[in-house]
């Protein structure tokens, strides 16, 4: 199979990158006002037998208070993947609101067996009209 002429005409972008070369590490979670526990299932695993990133995000969202989930939509997500999780690991999803309006939360996912932090994240929520 030959590469088509359209692809051959493509040129790399020059100048500044869209994303910075290095991303800042999010702060740790000092206070845990909302928590939920999960056990890693087979359906949470990718082909390498690690928990996939979709499961991590689902667990973070599940730790957000129901009153926020019922009245808002996830508008922004910033996430740092720090370590891997595996089948049958017990994971604690914890979060704490950054502001009094509950529009932003800091999150942490921790493997309970050894206390290893797996993920840090920040979510921003927008009220449903």
Residue ranges with predicted function:
Residues 48, 73, 83-85, 101:
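Short amphipathic alpha-helical interaction segments
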Residues 74-76, 120:
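Hydrophobic residues on conserved beta-strands that form the core of alpha/beta folds
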Residues 1-24, 28-30, 85-87, 97-129:
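HotDog/MaoC-like acyl-thioester-processing domains
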Residues 42, 62, 83, 127-129:
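Non-catalytic surface loops within mature trypsin-like serine protease
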Residues 62, 76, 80-87, 92:
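Extended serine/threonine-enriched, polar tracts that run as long, contiguous segments within proteins
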Residues 1-73:
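Hot-dog-fold acyl-thioester-processing enzymes
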Residues 37-41, 80, 124-126:
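Generic structural detector for well-ordered beta-strands
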């Amino acid at each position: 199979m030959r590469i088509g002429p359209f692809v051959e005409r493509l040129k790399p972008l020059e100048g500044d990158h869209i994303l910075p070369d290095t991303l800042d590490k999010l702060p740790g979670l000092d206070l845990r006002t909302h928590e939920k526990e999960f056990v890693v299932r087979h359906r949470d695993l990718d082909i390498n037998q690690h928990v996939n990133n979709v499961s991590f995000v689902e667990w973070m969202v599940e730790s957000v208070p129901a009153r926020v989930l019922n009245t808002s939509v996830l508008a922004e997500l910033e996430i740092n993947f720090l370590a891997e999780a595996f089948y049958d690991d017990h994971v604690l999803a914890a979060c704490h609101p950054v502001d009094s309006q509950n529009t932003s939360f800091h999150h942490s996912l921790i493997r309970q067996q050894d206390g290893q932090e797996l993920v840090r994240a920040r979510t921003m929520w927008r009220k449903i009209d």
